[in-house]
């Protein structure tokens, strides 16, 4: 069983850092493309002649296609060279931007959004497996942190950049601006990524769900799912909390959200060092500290400066956490990281949906304190499961 083996890397000598940074640029464009409609929804809907609600479904369809792709790609790709597969996903990303920019109607717009969903699911499901093949084992967490840095940076700039470009050159021009950056990412990956043949041992296996037969995988994915549920049960409703409870000004709101994003970017730069020193203690400490922050926000929600400080710390922890869980996939399933990555994408997407939905129901029917308390309880559940996971992993390895 791969879970009983020490972590191995397909590449023990050469580090292809050019490929890592090329993929990070690809991550940046992917995330910017995924969330660009958020800041352009009103003019987009008006131009296509649909309601804002229908236009917003473009985000939903990209998420749904990301899940379906992540669960099926490893099997469908077979022995295909993973370099060619990544390049194909980058082409889909560029094509998506062009389709949306020139969409004459709602159907073409949704087709473009579906393509970006396929690219997102395909890329993230392969990220851990690709990191294993690009750098030596002791640098895998650093490579994954760099990938996630592109994610964090895009999260910070996508909405304000989209809003600015939309006001300057129109929403179509904003989407079109992503195409040359995607083309640059394609060319950079083309010349910096090594050939990465498909794994003939895993390509012929049954679906990714077979991994649930391994206790350590089931427990780990459950812990990961609870973490993301807890995170988004709270974070989805940060804006109404800041506006109605903390009562920040519009400029103050923007500043706090920017602080969260910048702190998250810093977190991704630091987390690799911490993970290498203390892997499971870090995975346990992150949700524990976030649960403490959720409780502290309940007690100090009316103090602007304390809330800003707490949410900045929250952003640093929450954005660093995915690097930890992707590193867990790379360490736990070094020979099956693609299938494990596919399951991870699906679990995270489902957890985000469940967490935000549950948080919203509590927010509407009870009060914001109950929503934050729910988040804290889910995060504490993740702490308990991660602690059990570390003990199980230790017993299996021993």
Regions found by a protein language model. Give the residues of each.
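Cytoplasmic helix-loop-helix junction between adjacent transmembrane helices
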Residues: 112-150
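Conserved MFS/SLC helix-loop-helix module at the cytosolic interface between two early adjacent transmembrane helices
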Residues: 68-104
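Helix-to-loop junctions at the C-terminal end of transmembrane segments
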Residues: 69-81, 267-279, 363
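C-terminal transmembrane helical hairpin of 12-TM major facilitator-type secondary transporters
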Residues: 281-324
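Helix-breaking motifs and short loop linkers at transmembrane-helix boundaries and internal kinks
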Residues: 49, 81, 102-108, 247, ...
């Amino acid at each position: 069983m791969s879970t009983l083996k020490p972590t191995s890397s397909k590449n023990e000598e050469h580090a292809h850092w050019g490929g890592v940074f090329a993929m990070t640029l690809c991550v940046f464009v992917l995330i910017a493309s995924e969330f660009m409609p958020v800041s352009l929804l009103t003019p987009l809907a008006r131009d296509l002649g649909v309601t804002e609600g229908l236009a917003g479904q473009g985000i939903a369809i990209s998420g749904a296609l990301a899940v379906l792709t992540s669960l099926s790609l490893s099997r469908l790709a077979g022995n295909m060279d993973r370099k060619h597969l990544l390049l194909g996903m980058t082409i889909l990303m560029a094509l998506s931007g062009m389709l949306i920019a020139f969409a004459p109607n709602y159907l073409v717009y949704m087709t473009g959004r579906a393509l970006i969903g396929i690219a997102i699911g395909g890329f993230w499901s392969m990220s851990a497996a690709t990191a294993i093949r690009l750098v030596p084992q002791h640098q895998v967490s650093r490579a994954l942190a760099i990938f996630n840095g592109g994610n964090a940076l895009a999260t910070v700039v996508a909405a304000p950049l989209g809003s600015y470009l939309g006001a300057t050159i129109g929403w179509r021009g904003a989407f079109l601006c992503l195409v040359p950056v995607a083309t640059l990412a394609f060319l950079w990956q083309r010349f910096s990524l090594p050939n990465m043949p498909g794994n003939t041992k895993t390509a012929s296996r049954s679906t990714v769900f077979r991994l649930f037969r391994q206790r350590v995988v089931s427990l780990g994915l459950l812990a990961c799912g609870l973490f993301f549920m807890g995170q988004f049960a709270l974070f989805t409703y940060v804006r109404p909390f800041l506006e109605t409870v903390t009562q920040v000004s519009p400029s103050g709101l923007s500043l706090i959200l920017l602080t969260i994003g910048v702190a998250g970017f810093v977190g991704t730069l630091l987390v690799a060092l911490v993970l290498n020193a203390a892997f499971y203690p870090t995975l346990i400490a992150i949700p524990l500290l976030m649960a403490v922050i959720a409780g502290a926000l309940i007690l100090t929600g009316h103090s602007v400066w304390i809330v800003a400080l707490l949410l900045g710390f929250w952003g640093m922890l929450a954005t660093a956490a995915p690097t930890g869980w992707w590193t867990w996939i790379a360490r736990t399933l070094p020979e099956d990281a693609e299938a494990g990555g596919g399951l991870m994408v699906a679990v995270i997407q489902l957890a985000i949906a469940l967490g935000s939905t549950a948080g919203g129901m509590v927010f509407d029917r009870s009060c914001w304190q109950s929503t934050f308390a729910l988040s804290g309880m889910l995060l504490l559940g993740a702490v308990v499961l991660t602690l059990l996971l570390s003990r199980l992993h230790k017993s299996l390895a021993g």
